[in-house]
């Protein structure tokens, strides 16, 4: 996707 996952709250 064009939006990096870092923008959201990573739940790893």
UniProtKB/Swiss-Prot annotation:
Sites bearing Leucine amide, chain numbering: 12
Source taxon at top rank: Eukaryota
Locations listed in the record: Secreted
Primary location class: secreted
Secreted among keywords: yes
GO biological process: neuropeptide signaling pathway
Entry GO terms, CC: extracellular region
Alphabetic keyword roster: Amidation, Neuropeptide, Secreted
Functional description taken from the UniProt entry: Mediates visceral muscle contractile activity (myotropic activity).
Family as reported in the entry's similarity comment: Belongs to the pyrokinin family.
Protein name from the UniProt record: Locustamyotropin-1
Organism: Locusta migratoria (Migratory locust)
């Amino acid at each position: 996707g064009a939006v990096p996952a870092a923008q959201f709250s990573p739940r790893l």
